[in-house]
């Protein structure tokens, strides 16, 4: 059965015509879910039992995946084309890619004997054990009130799920998620009624209709908007409210003395940033420095001046306690290198209730990689700073990767007028060839021109390209100074496997278990629909009532959607019952255990913080130096060496030959090898700029399509702000306020 989305528009003369397909592609996913929701609701009322298919589509319960695939030759053709052409599947492909695959694999239809065809199908169905599926007892229609209750709950979940990572969300995606969550019970009409309720109450704020039809409208939550307002209010109210540490002359003299003693040379921009830290009278100020501009070098004399400025000028107001906070451990290391010994991750500082109580008016909090800090975390930090009368310096690059969580707070504060010094002169590539220096500069605002400065190999087949990336890595003289950056985990794994095979490391080491985490939001992890038999759950904290310990893994044995419980089979054989809606979603992960081998000489990368080894943190790289006995000995690039016990508990370690670009922010290497697939959703202006500027000297780039690559690196992938939605509210036009029947009519 298919749902058909017709491109028919009636003009003012009463004639019908086809319009541009852009808006149809934009709403294709929503239209498909409207169809699925209506179909599921009616099938459920007729008594048919349903279950989600491979791609989330409704399937009749009792029909196996093998039986479905037997009669899905066309779908298999498209799946095979997507895999061979772009290395993707129907779930990860865009509507445009699926359309292209459908067109390029389509054959002209031939006239057929329908009676004979049906007879053949029945015979084949019997051969594979496919019996007719009969409906069970008819289900009475849910009352309108009950359907609205379900729709309210589903929409609430959709809002929590989407606003966890984006402050403003495409309206169609929000509705689609709500329909998916309530599938079989509600339809689009129910969701529209609830949308009217939440917009009328102000819980959800909706952007003006885009009459040009170029994109979907955005919506945001009142909570996200209020959070942004509080952040902006903190910054604005803190202007001209603190005593400068030094006057301009004292700052110049102190910086000169420290530079001379330490043998440092700051350029004009770095010096201006350091001077601002010492002379500002604002509680909050920022330093926006491009990748590799020497932000750590700039911080060193400024931090020394804050802490010990009185040693250089008796008249200064120095003697400050400086705390360093970063969203990643790489940022924490950079802060310590800058002289801030008291540095830790922002998340651990916020989780420590005692940490904020010892702040005073003579405390400076330096938040590094501020562009990776979510609005929620920044607001929490600002509350502590505000209460203590302390001050904060936000350091980052608003053009690099943004926080996975919602809210580009650092960029928002700059737009609102926060005092900010910009550091733009790149230092990381100062000894690189001219074409590399030029490519790095151009990648900031003209990425398509940066491509012209690079030597790029075009290899269309994904597996062949991954093999070429591996071969390039093997040519490197110093593995410690080589980064292979990919956009997907599939590419990362393939490169790692290829390198290990070439180095003859396979089958020569010890196997251990690691946990591959799925991509679930906290809201999803609290939802029973996210669980299915075969998944595995890793617990990040102990739950006494359930009887599970930190680090334990349980396999999902069964899911009871009626009472909302998940039954787990633990490693020791005991059964544990978990009720996801009663958990926070923060302290457990849904994923799968996998076995990984480490051999003598393997390069590794730490992927979490569960090892609890002094000085070893997420993102650190090293080499396996011994695999004898029950331990794997690792020598880290930092010089530390530890033996790690191999057991049943998953270890957060992976092969370290290739990694995704997002995990490499803050790193630098002599040689950077880039995988740039033009069709990848992870390739955009931000990722290209961030990944390219990891290099100190050389860049080796690979793509599937050189012609399309220029368009891919120009794609904008910016986080949205709730304020952007509020600004457009004045001329809002809501479709559900018009009398119309949106629910599709299906004859069953």
Q: What function would you assign to each model-found segment?
A:
Residues 1-748:
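Conserved ATP-binding/catalytic motifs of P-loop helicase motor domains
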